[in-house]
């Protein structure tokens, strides 16, 4: 049976963690990005479909291409982030199911069912993007997820073959805590949940 995480871990992953918009001038290494993936890849997805495809944008040239795709309000925060992760969803994810879920013919559940494919890819790549945020926080990084961008432009620039489509973006780095606003309220348990 798994043990309960200590208070420091819970604070780092959830309670004290914040969405960051400004960043310290501290680089994020390729090894850290690999570590993030090697953590979140183990988190669950439907039939282990693992549809997320991540582009970690670090170089100045590629960051400039990405800046042409984001909404004006997201330009500075993206420009100054050491890394921006493009969370994509592979619409051909089911082709990997014979390897990823070999004990049944799960691939046949998806072939020719475009709506089901897109729903599954979107839902599970969203899960994986959230797992990425937690993995980044777990290794001491901060994140700033964003949905303010032109999806067609992102797809044309970074996924031109049409097989992968962007879901959302996540800036990653070491956040500048001095620029954080006070934490905003959240719905209470009774407002958000029911026990039946």
UniProtKB/Swiss-Prot annotation:
Keywords recorded for this protein, A-Z: Flavoprotein, FMN, NAD, NADP, Oxidoreductase
One MF term in the entry's GO annotations: oxidoreductase activity
Gene3D superfamilies, per database record: NADH Oxidase (3.40.109.10)
EC id: 1.-.-.-
InterPro entries: Nitroreductase (IPR029479), Nitroreductase-like (IPR000415), Nitroreductase_HadB/RutE (IPR050461), RutE-like (IPR023936)
Enzyme class per UniProt: oxidoreductase
Cofactors: FMN
Family stated for the protein in its record: Belongs to the nitroreductase family. HadB/RutE subfamily.
NCBIfam families, sorted: PRK05365.1
Protein name stated in the entry: Putative NADH dehydrogenase/NAD(P)H nitroreductase Pnuc_0932
Lineage of the organism: Bacteria, Pseudomonadati, Pseudomonadota, Betaproteobacteria, Burkholderiales
